[in-house]
Amino acid sequence: AGKLPTVTFYKPQGNLNEHSGYADVAKGDEHIADVLRHLEKSPQWDHMLVVVTYDENGGWWDHAAPPKADRFGPGSRIPAMIISPFAKKGVVDHTLYDTTSIIRFITHRWSLPTLPGVAMRDEAMAKAGGARIGDLTDALVLQ
């Protein structure tokens, strides 16, 4: 316990990844809940941010059209949850995020230079009149 690197990515094995058609969504939910229970017991928990997200929307219908940018996205909405002692409690954050928001947060947190692909995404969004893509900080209470 307490030995996770500063940044860790975890992807469940296929039968637990909640992909419709071949994975059991309920078992995937149970698995993620179990992982979170273990993380919450970790000595690192007080300084941890967990983002649970997916690589696509799974083909489920969504009433909201994707934001306009270039042909590369951002695409349709995907679910994401922030679980952390730093998460704003009882809040649904309406900031526009995409999968680069995780990279944006890491970049912000450690004062790293913006990656070229992220800068290109920002340019495409601005040219299309789209909203700024967030870096997760709007969902957090940081000191």
What is each stretch, according to the model?
Residues 1-143:
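N-terminal pro-sequences and low-complexity stem/linker regions of secreted or lumenal proteins
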